[in-house]
Curated annotation (Swiss-Prot):
Organism: Drosophila erecta (Fruit fly)
Keywords assigned by UniProt, alphabetized: Differentiation, Nucleus, Sexual differentiation
Subcellular location field: Nucleus speckle
Biased composition range(s): Basic and acidic residues: 1-18, 25-40
GO cellular component, one term: nuclear speck
Superkingdom of the source species: Eukaryota
Biased composition (Basic residues): 59-73, 81-108
Other information: The sexual regulation of tra occurs through a mechanism of sex-specific alternative RNA splicing. The non-sex-specific RNA expressed in males is not translated.
GO terms under biological process: cell differentiation; epithelium regeneration; female sex determination; female sex differentiation; mRNA splicing, via spliceosome; regulation of stem cell division
Protein name, UniProt field: Female-specific protein transformer
GO molecular function annotations of the record: pre-mRNA binding
Pfam families: Transformer
Length: 178
């Protein structure tokens, strides 16, 4: 972390050079902070009844913020940082392939392509073509076609008389073939 004169993260560290580096307004307010804190603390119900333990607890709570622990940047920090950076990059390069694969798969679960199902519907040809077969269009040059299917002479609405009753040979027992 670079500490320039104007950087906000340097504000804690400025007092290492004595009160010279602090501005007048900051110095004036610094004396007042204890009063303000005491005013605030009066409103709060303490966790422990006895004051020593309460103060100890407050002090320990405040220590948890990372900046107050280390006032000055330590000498070894640069080498430490370099080492940490190297190890981090090594870990990233090792795990990158699996990470990319997981990231690609995560938005949607695996969707198979739609399966195309063919149903072969059996239609007698005279039904398929209509009664007169393929009708020719007169607007175009007529190609020599084979003669169309002869129209079916007659179709029984019910089962034709000479066939016996099928043993469930048609589609279903309850749906007679018409």
């Amino acid at each position: 972390m670079k500490m320039d004169a104007d950087s906000s993260c340097g504000a804690d560290h400025r007092d290492s050079h004595g009160s010279r580096s602090r501005s007048r307004r900051e110095r004036e307010q610094h004396g007042r902070t204890s009063n303000r804190d005491s005013k605030k603390k009066e409103h709060k119900v303490p966790y422990f009844a006895d004051e020593v333990r309460e103060q100890d607890r407050v002090r320990r709570l405040r220590k948890r913020s990372p900046r107050s622990t280390r006032r000055s940047a330590s000498r070894s920090q640069s080498s430490d940082r370099r080492h940490r950076h190297r190890s981090r990059s090594r870990n990233r390069s090792r795990s990158r392939s699996s990470e990319r694969r997981r990231r690609q798969r995560s938005p949607r679960r695996y969707n198979p392509p739609p399966k195309i199902i063919n149903y072969y519907l059996q239609v007698p040809p005279q039904d398929f073509y209509g009664m007169s077969g393929m009708q020719q269009r007169f607007g175009y040059q007529r190609l020599p076609h084979p003669p169309p299917f002869p129209p079916a002479p007659y179709r029984f609405r019910q089962r034709p008389p000479f066939l016996g009753a099928p043993r469930f040979g048609y589609r279903n027992a309850w749906r007679p073939p018409y």
